[in-house]
Amino acid sequence: MSRAAYDLADKVVLITGGNGGIGAATARTLLRRGARVVIADIDPATPGRATDLHPIHSLGCVADVRDPATLEAAVAQAVDHFGRLDVVIANAGLLAKAATLRNTPTADIEATLAVNVTGVANTVTAALPQVIARQGQVVLISSVFAFLNGMGTIPYAMSKAAVEQLGRGLRIELADHGVSVLTAYFSLVQTDMIARGVDEDPVVMELLGALPKAMLKRITPEQAAAGIADGLESRAVRVIRPNLWGPVSSLRGVLNPTLDTRFSRDRRILDVLARLDSRPAAVVPTPAATSAAPSRRKKP
């Protein structure tokens, strides 16, 4: 038997990385559907930005997903302010400068995984007691890079595959508690993070130009947010946008070896990767930099 539709009216939703990009768009969408939102972000300006979204139904908390204590404090603030917490959306994420693995410093790999993997687990862990008590929902923001070849951005792809596995495991662990787990997979989303990490990098643009055009279709943060909200209302297990990625995910066991073989023989792709090999090592943004540009936290 399928679960009943989930009415977002008056539900309290905590969103990490909610100051820009997908997080901010999701907050706006959920507010329009009657929810109360709690934005948890590393940016010190978060409380004021939350008030700008809605003076009554939005709350901002300064939190770093790498620090469990700050997330626990954000959950406590949410409950103190709104009296409950129904949904947690682990949206905060980090995208490093494109590079081959051998040209990526170990510190940069660790920084990416600290936010995109450990930070997601920290977020869920902090919120779970409240979410279980409300038989609510957990939302994890993965990416099509969970199943698409991650050449040139291996740490990011690794992290999103890990988020997918987190979602699968949580879905079973929380089944007896009446909690739903939604994993969202997005391709290129038109955010500041993608502008900096993709559009402003000519080598990355050249690499993308060698891929099938269907893979390059973009969506807006609002489209991603609508997918999340729709998924919550139906207690969906997964949301994939654009929709064309659904069959790719379902057929990944067949398609991935075929695509990997094609990519490994494509001279354009190999030449671009050689250029990534030869340029200066990648540098992951510092926490201060991500605070100044909050939309770098998350994505596709």
Show the residue positions of the predicted features:
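Conserved glycine-rich cofactor-binding loop
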Residues: 19-20
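The beta1-alpha1 cofactor-binding region of Rossmann-like NAD(H)/NADP(H)-dependent oxidoreductases
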Residues: 62-73, 106
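Substrate-binding pocket helix/loop in short-chain dehydrogenase/reductase
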Residues: 99-101, 105-111, 135
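Active-site helix of classical SDR
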Residues: 124, 159-162
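A short, exposed helix-loop element centered on a Lys and neighboring polar residues
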Residues: 124-125, 168
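SDR active-site lid
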Residues: 172, 176-243
